[in-house]
Amino acid sequence: MATVEPETTPTPNPPTTEEEKTESNQEVANPEHYIKHPLQNRWALWFFKNDKSKTWQANLRLISKFDTVEDFWALYNHIQLSSNLMPGCDYSLFKDGIEPMWEDEKNKRGGRWLITLNKQQRRSDLDRFWLETLLCLIGESFDDYSDDVCGAVVNVRAKGDKIAIWTTECENREAVTHIGRVYKERLGLPPKIVIGYQSHADTATKSGSTTKNRFVV
């Protein structure tokens, strides 16, 4: 005679405690996976392509704006390296609200620390120097004088490339020289290499191919 096994009632799972719920949520959504790291300023990246048939301003194009570390790297990794640009092209990174031109209200009384590279340095140094320049800007690397920084420009030219950090007030000796010293150190330039700071006004009115330096480090 067949025997019938008695039905067994499944044991219910014990209720989840609040602590276990919290642990479970942390596993699913670790804040590090989705929280972006904000920068102190919002920045705008511009691109200039020298088309002789257009005006200077028509050749200048805003690529993108960003205000987090993650968005900076996403943009940087998406665009062409400076060393791959055609001669006559520029990248400019400026604080949002400042246009990369001398005439801008924040730039017109300012100037630039200028790094001049020879043609051989396009392959060896240009991209490294430009990235370090960008990191100096977005990382506010100039201590109390980071507010004096407006932006930076890389000019890709057949005769030799240039990188410059622009500041807002050329008469502010303390800020300008501090920025220059920190910048030179961050680029790893040896002491024997001298870099110069030129006011935009002097550059605009220069007679000849060179502009006098207001400061050197």
Swiss-Prot record:
Keywords: Acetylation, Autism, Autism spectrum disorder, Chromosomal rearrangement, Cytoplasm, Host-virus interaction, Initiation factor, mRNA transport, Nucleus, Phosphoprotein, Protein biosynthesis, RNA-binding, Translation regulation, Transport. This is Eukaryotic translation initiation factor 4E. GO terms for cellular component: chromatoid body; cytoplasm; cytoplasmic ribonucleoprotein granule; cytoplasmic stress granule; cytosol; eukaryotic translation initiation factor 4F complex; extracellular exosome; glutamatergic synapse. Changing residue 209 to D: Phosphomimetic mutant; confers resistance to cellular stress and DNA-damaging agents. Does not affect ability to rescue growth of yeast lacking a functional EIF4E/CDC33 gene. GO terms for molecular function: DNA-binding transcription factor binding; enzyme binding; eukaryotic initiation factor 4G binding; mRNA cap binding; RNA 7-methylguanosine cap binding; RNA binding; RNA cap binding; translation initiation factor activity. The lineage of its organism: Eukaryota, Metazoa, Chordata, Craniata, Vertebrata. The modification Phosphoserine is found at residue 209. Coiled coil: none annotated. It comes from Homo sapiens.
